[in-house]
Design a protein with these regions (language model features):
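Short solvent-exposed strand/turn elements
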Residues: 95-113, 329-350
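Solvent-exposed, flexible loop/coil residues
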Residues: 32, 37, 42, 91-93, ...
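Assembly/oligomerization scaffold segments
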Residues: 1-114, 169-171, 176, 202-211
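Charged- and aromatic-enriched interaction segments used to assemble
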Residues: 94-217, 375-376
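Acidic, small/polar-enriched beta strand-loop surface segments
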Residues: 2-14, 75, 164, 176-178, ...
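Beta-strand secondary-structure signal
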Residues: 48-52, 69-71, 99-101, 226, ...
Length: 376
């Protein structure tokens, strides 16, 4: 067992890193960290971790190696499993450190190129489950998906890319939660699991917000989407279209055109076009808050009620990303990235160009007025 640095200020009882050391040939637990950064992000193909250890007396020198298997637990709940990508030894100002960085189990699907071939009559559920099992992801949870008539695997195409295209054709999402690979819909309209507040009366206070950043961004918002597929004659044919009529009527023209994977002419392509238009709008409002890391675990794919009296925000948000961090200056902080819930976005989409078309309220609102105007 490596020497543990005797520094109670750095001791974090909530976080546990287990490493299966190839060099030492055993299972080791690490409880003390100088710094860490753990990203749980629904929109990345593989989540990432980064730990910094104070290496007093060379205590950790032989413990870590690239490709070592690791598991990360917060408050006794598994939040990530994966492998080490990089081990960095460094010293500065007379102190020695080790930085250990890596990604979760899904990284193997990214790092492996598929063998070029032509796949026929593919069952995506079976295909994805078999690939996950072959690359070390022990569990899958996949909604029923339609058969794919044909898929040509190109040279240099990753296993993850193939899975992503199959999932996208079904207008679904994919994500890894600890050791389970999911394909389905995000829980964007469930009842809030958490409530975050700032500036509210004491009887309304919940989890206090330390910092708040709300962005309204037009990048990636489309006025029109057209999905093309190939006809038997070899010519392109339109399979699905969708428009944001408010943008078009107001002279805001931002068209996106893309091709489909299959040519069965199903309603899937119209749904894909609609998703292009709505996805851009639904993600145009992005909220990032920070809180003190708590015993209560905060995870993505859940909703939260956020009330902030400074920006006049009172809405239900969907949690897309959670980052657990620790450093000497700030201590243990949880950063949470969110977008409005489906219901909140539906309300704003229907009211584009008016006060209700935004996530914030009137600057002059009292708290009672803010409380009465909840979105979502």
């Amino acid at each position: 067992m490596p020497v543990i640095v005797d520094n109670k200020k750095q001791y974090d009882t909530n976080l546990l890193l287990i490493v299966y050391s190839s060099r030492l040939g055993g299972r080791y637990e690490c409880h003390r960290f100088r710094e860490y950064n753990i990203d749980l992000d629904l929109e990345t193909d593989a989540d990432a971790f980064d730990f910094v250890f104070k290496n007093a007396n060379s205590g950790y020198t032989s413990l870590f190696s690239k490709f070592d298997v690791v598991e990360i637990y917060l408050n006794d709940v598994g939040i990530m499993a994966g492998r080490v990508d990089t081990v960095t030894y460094y010293w500065e100002a007379g102190e020695s450190y080790i930085r250990v960085a890596g990604r979760d189990l899904a990284a193997t699907l990214i790092d492996n190129h598929a063998l070029p071939t032509t796949l026929q009559n593919i069952n995506p559920n079976q295909y994805i489950a078999e690939k996950c099992s072959a690359y070390g992801i022990p569990r899958t949870n996949i909604v029923p998906m339609s058969l794919v008539d044909k898929y040509v695997v190109g040279v240099g195409e990753s296993e993850m890319s193939i899975i992503a295209k199959m999932v996208d054709n079904e207008n679904k999402k994919m994500w890894l939660d600890y050791k389970t690979f999911h394909v389905g819909n995000w829980a964007m309209d469930t009842q809030p699991t958490y409530t975050f507040t700032n500036g509210v009366p004491i009887d309304k206070m919940c989890i206090p917000i330390l910092s708040f950043e709300l962005e309204d961004d037009g990048d990636g918002v489309f006025s029109e989407s057209i999905v093309y597929g190939g006809a038997s004659s070899g010519e392109n044919r339109v399979l699905g279209t969708s428009k944001n009529n408010w943008m078009i009527n107001n002279g805001i023209k931002r068209r996106v055109v893309r091709s489909s994977q299959n040519n069965d002419g199903s309603d899937t392509y119209t749904a894909n076009a609609e998703d292009d238009v709505r996805y851009g709008f639904d993600n145009s409002h992005r909220l990032e808050i920070s809180i003190r890391t708590r015993k209560e675990l905060i995870k993505p794919n859940a909703t939260a009620w956020v009330i902030d009296t400074i920006t006049k925000t009172n809405a239900i948000f969907f949690i897309k990303k959670v980052t657990y961090t620790k450093n000497l200056s700030s201590g243990s902080i949880t950063k949470i990235t969110m977008v409005p819930s489906k219901k909140a976005n539906d309300e704003m989409y229907a009211a584009q160009g008016s006060l209700n078309g935004g996530i914030t309220g009137k600057a002059a609102w009292t708290f009672n007025e803010l409380w009465a105007n909840k979105k979502g």
